[in-house]
Amino acid sequence: MRLTAKQVTWLKVSLHLAGLLPFLWLVWAINHGGLGADPVKDIQHFTGRTALKFLLATLLITPLARYAKQPLLIRTRRLLGLWCFAWATLHLTSYALLELGVNNLALLGKELITRPYLTLGIISWVILLALAFTSTQAMQRKLGKHWQQLHNFVYLVAILAPIHYLWSVKIISPQPLIYAGLAVLLLALRYKKLRSLFNRLRKQVHNKLSV
């Protein structure tokens, strides 16, 4: 049985709650000693993992809609993507304000350049910013064919974000490996599309170098 438009609306409400409830829990944990011995790191990892969860959920929608024959599921993809960006922004903000501190924000640029895992993180965030800004139907019409080209960069984020997570932890634990494995699996489901994009990019580069 296919989902109806009304059911998808309620699904969207549930997804909004899924994006909001972790934030409410985090606020509670900060104020009631619910974090560990290093609360700053706990906040950074929690916000980063939540952003990664929404990224993986966003990537899951298209194959799930196709294989489950639920085309209306596509309507939830933008919502999940925006929550991914929101949590990624909280992740970046927690690093800038809690790790560096308000008085040391001038160091942020240097940190992002000199620490490779931070470089991957900021590249991912900038891409998510561009995708969030252009996620409306109005921007889709305005950009035309370039809209899809831009939004294909989500696959690059799906590669960079798990590497950023793996690189940021001092001791490799199962959790970042699981996220990386899920990202690889979701990208593998798009093997044909990714191969087509790679061949097209290689052809464009070859043509420019041949001029």
Curated annotation (Swiss-Prot):
| Gene field | msrQ
Q: Which GO CC terms are listed, alphabetically?
A: plasma membrane
- One GO-annotated biological process of the protein: protein repair
InterPro entries associated with the record: Fe3_Rdtase_TM_dom, MsrQ-like
Main function: Part of the MsrPQ system that repairs oxidized periplasmic proteins containing methionine sulfoxide residues (Met-O), using respiratory chain electrons. Thus protects these proteins from oxidative-stress damage caused by reactive species of oxygen and chlorine generated by the host defense mechanisms. MsrPQ is essential for the maintenance of envelope integrity under bleach stress, rescuing a wide series of structurally unrelated periplasmic proteins from methionine oxidation, including the primary periplasmic chaperone SurA and the lipoprotein Pal.
Q: Where does this protein chiefly localize? A: membrane
Could you tell me where this protein is found in the cell?
Cell inner membrane
The organism named in the record is: Escherichia coli O139:H28 (strain E24377A / ETEC)
Segments passing through the bilayer: 17-37, 82-102, 116-136, 153-173
- Superkingdom is Bacteria
Member of which family?
Belongs to the MsrQ family.
What is the name of the protein in this document? Protein-methionine-sulfoxide reductase heme-binding subunit MsrQ
Cofactor names:
FMN; heme b
- Molecular function GO terms recorded: electron transfer activity; FMN binding; heme binding; metal ion binding; oxidoreductase activity, acting on diphenols and related substances as donors
Subunit structure, as described in the record: Heterodimer of a catalytic subunit (MsrP) and a heme-binding subunit (MsrQ).
Per UniProt, the cofactor note for this protein states: Binds 1 FMN per subunit.
Question: How is this protein positioned relative to the membrane?
Answer: Multi-pass membrane protein
Keywords from UniProt, A to Z, are:
Cell inner membrane, Cell membrane, Electron transport, Flavoprotein, FMN, Heme, Iron, Membrane, Metal-binding, Transmembrane, Transmembrane helix, Transport
